[in-house]
């Protein structure tokens, strides 16, 4: 615990996988602790590491306020049984809006990982940005203006997430 926040980890994090020279991918999501329409839903961040070919789950880290303990236990159980991201996609908890959402955050992490493995999405990790040729690329920073003012990547255009629909014309269609 760090004040009111819970930080939890299970399995192998990316740093350890790199040290062991194990080929892996990771995904990070930021779901709510329970149904968003129910009051007092709190943010959490879930990062998982997995084999990019087989989907075997290597590790997971979760930071949040509510429900972190049960989500990290779900990840630990899948890792113990040498499970995959496909097993995560099947995770279900009893649904009650004050405590969970219709799709459990761990299942959502599995869905995002599947999208990465199948090529539906091609993530770019922050550590890779300096190696990417940025010519003919459009780098969009969707943070708030206050967050953007704390520092940004060279050439990034700031359009806060809440304003994207109103400012679609500012987005380059060919980059």
What are these regions (language model features)?
Residues 65-84:
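A short, polar/charged loop-to-alpha-helix boundary motif
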Residues 31-33, 92-95, 146, 163-165:
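Residue-level detector of flexible, active-site-proximal loop/helix-junction positions
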Residues 130-175:
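Positively charged, proline/Ser/Thr-rich regional signature most characteristic
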Residues 1-10, 81, 86-96:
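Active-site-proximal substrate-binding core of FAD-dependent oxidoreductases
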Residues 1-66, 101, 105-131, 137:
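Mid-to-C-terminal Rossmann-like scaffold of FAD/NAD(P)H-dependent oxidoreductases
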């Amino acid at each position: 615990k760090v004040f009111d926040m819970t930080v939890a980890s299970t399995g192998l994090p990316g740093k350890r996988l790199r040290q062991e020279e194990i080929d892996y991918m990771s995904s990070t999501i930021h779901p709510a602790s329970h149904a968003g329409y129910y009051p007092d839903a709190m943010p959490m961040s879930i990062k998982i590491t997995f084999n990019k070919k087989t989907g075997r789950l290597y590790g997971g880290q979760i930071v949040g306020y509510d429900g972190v303990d049960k989500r990290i236990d779900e990840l630990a159980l899948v890792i113990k049984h040498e499970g995959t991201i496909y097993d995560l996609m099947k995770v279900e908890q009893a649904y009650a809006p004050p405590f969970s959402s219709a799709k459990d955050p761990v299942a959502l992490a599995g869905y995002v990982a599947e999208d990465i493995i199948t090529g539906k999405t091609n993530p770019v990790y922050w550590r890779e940005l300096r190696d990417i040729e940025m010519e003919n690329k459009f780098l969009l920073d969707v943070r708030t203006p206050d967050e953007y003012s704390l520092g940004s990547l060279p050439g990034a255009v700031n359009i806060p997430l809440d304003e994207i629909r109103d400012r679609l014309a500012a987005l380059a269609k060919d980059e």
